[in-house]
Amino acid sequence: MFFGNSLPFNPEQDIPSLAGKVILVTGANIGLGKQCVLEYARHQPSLIWLVARTLDKAQTTVNEIHQQLDVKNTPPIKPLAMDLSSLSSVTTAARTIVAESPRLDILMLNAGIMAAPPGLTNEGYELQFGTNYIGHALFTKLLLPVLEKTAAIPDADVRIISLSSHGHVYAPKEGVLFDTLRTDAESLGAYGRYGQSKLAIILWTRQMARKYPQFTLASIHPGVVRTNLMNNATGSPWVIRVLGMVANKVVTPVDQGVKNQLWASVAREVKSGEYYEPVGIGGPQTPKGEDDALGLKVWEWTEKELQGYE
């Protein structure tokens, strides 16, 4: 499914040569993340980091991609383990990149969970907020040395693309309830917790764009895409889960649904800090997505929480 006024985008034709570039994709063992790696690999970057929750999952996907593409013409793809619900795992993964990667041109923050049951991350954050938002915020923060070094290279074009969702409209009316972020936030419901995490991504992206003008950042909604995200939405009411599985038969296939994030990672028209519906349609669907006072509060809260991981 695509939206009115969607921009035309053909990954095969519209992704330019990626020669010399290094790309990293989180949540890359399945769905949109795996499709991103496949599409990027066809344009010959110097290296792709394929990140999954476990090294076995990452390596299995690397092997699958090598089987799907002509191995002789496939760029190096390195598997990397990172569990976003564990900030120690995030820290370890980021240190590996900083130590081993000479540059980083595209950072695709693709991984996430949806409508999970109430729970906490290893460090005690609400599970969806911690996984979808905090883990990626820390990962990006720790990668700043290599991102800034890359941005200083002549003609470099550093992109940081975050998967948000149209589901940010389900966030609480206040936007982000800070007193729930170190609880399981059961009272918000599965989709309230999900919406809160996805709204935070939009707000963080806007703040990052202001503070790091040398990068191009965007948050995106991929559309309603045929992935296993809804199958794992075990915290959602059973009726919604069933409808989601039925909808999976008719919604956008992954090779089409991936277009918005790929577009955001290469297109010249991207406005840094913007949120995009597919493909290339700008603007949050709720006023809270453009609330810069709330965004600054989210930024300051996040910076305080992540002190000590630098």
Region roles according to the model:
Residues M1-A19, Q285, G289-E310:
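Intracellular terminal tails of multi-pass secondary transporters
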Residues L50, M82, K249, P287-E290:
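Pocket-edge positions in alpha/beta enzyme catalytic cores
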Residues V90, S197, G244-P284, D292-L296:
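C-terminal helical subdomain
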Residues R42, A99, S265-E269, Q307:
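Residues at helix-coil transition
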Residues G167, G283-T286:
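Short active-site-adjacent structural elements
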Residues K72, T183-D184, S236-V246:
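A short C-terminal helix-loop "cap" of Rossmann-like NAD(P)-dependent dehydrogenase/epimerase domains
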Residues Q59-V62, R95, R206, V258, ...:
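Residues within alpha-helical segments
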Residues F2-N231:
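Rossmann-fold NAD(P)H-dependent dehydrogenase/reductase core
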